[in-house]
Amino acid sequence: MYKVSEFSEMTGLSKETLRYYAEVKLIEPAYIDPKNNYRYYDDGSYFLALLLVKLRSFGFTIQEMISVMEDESFAHLEDLLIQKKETIRLQMVELQQKTEEIDAFLASGKELKNK
């Protein structure tokens, strides 16, 4: 069992994030000491936390992560990952278009300046 401070250090999740994730039922302590309300996490919690960190790095929202936790099937996770990948791909296309528009705008400004 790991204390919150140890678990936070191991996973890279802040104590506040762990508290919030427990609030929204994403990851709950394996044990809460009734004497002092200290929260403890176990190895299962550790692997779950690593998954949550990875999903967050992929841009998953809290709601999407809750959806993954509610439906633990790999097929569901795979579907969500494919959807997220497509969303990111579309964002990349949009960003590329914006950079091209900025380049064109800058070029037109330089042309006006040189006249």
List where the protein language model places each region:
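Short, charged amphipathic alpha-helical surface segments
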Residues: 53, 71-114
